[in-house]
Amino acid sequence: MTPSVLIDSDVLVWLTRGHEGAARRLQALPAWRISAVTYIELAQGCRDKADLARLKKGLAARNTEIVPLTEDISLRAAELIDQLALSHGMRLADALIGATAIALQATLITANVKHLSAVDGLSFEAFLPYPSMCNRGRSQIRPPR
């Protein structure tokens, strides 16, 4: 059985910028799953209706599951904000996406290691897009603590 993964917004942004490491990693996935928050962030980044149509077409081509927010996800995100906003700069979108991955028991593929590495119970795969991050777009996986 293929492990469950959730793709963070930042990795999809790298993909749209033509990053080969992002393309390679995402092509390896049999199916894509994103949080509703990720979809909203991507849609907000569209410049016009044609851009939005391309986004929707691209996500549909990959049979992307957009995971809706639930009460449990919202409550867990609020806990993450309480625990990590002041100490680690946790922001709303990151808390909601992290809480979604926890609720799904999915590994979150993300470049946002700074905020998400402190989240207990979150399994994440660090996508490191910059050569200065030591591994030129390859990933490192951390199981949940």
Please place each PLM-identified region on the residue numbering.
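Short, well-structured N-terminal submotif of metal-dependent ribonuclease cores
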Residues: 1-34, 44-58, 131-134, 143-145
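Short beta-strand->loop
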Residues: 70, 121-131
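Generic structural signal for small/hydrophobic residues in well-ordered secondary structure
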Residues: 8-9, 42, 77, 101, ...
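Short loop/helix-cap segments at secondary-structure boundaries that form the rim of catalytic
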Residues: 23-27, 114-121
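Nucleotide phosphate-binding site architecture
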Residues: 12-13, 40-43, 117, 125
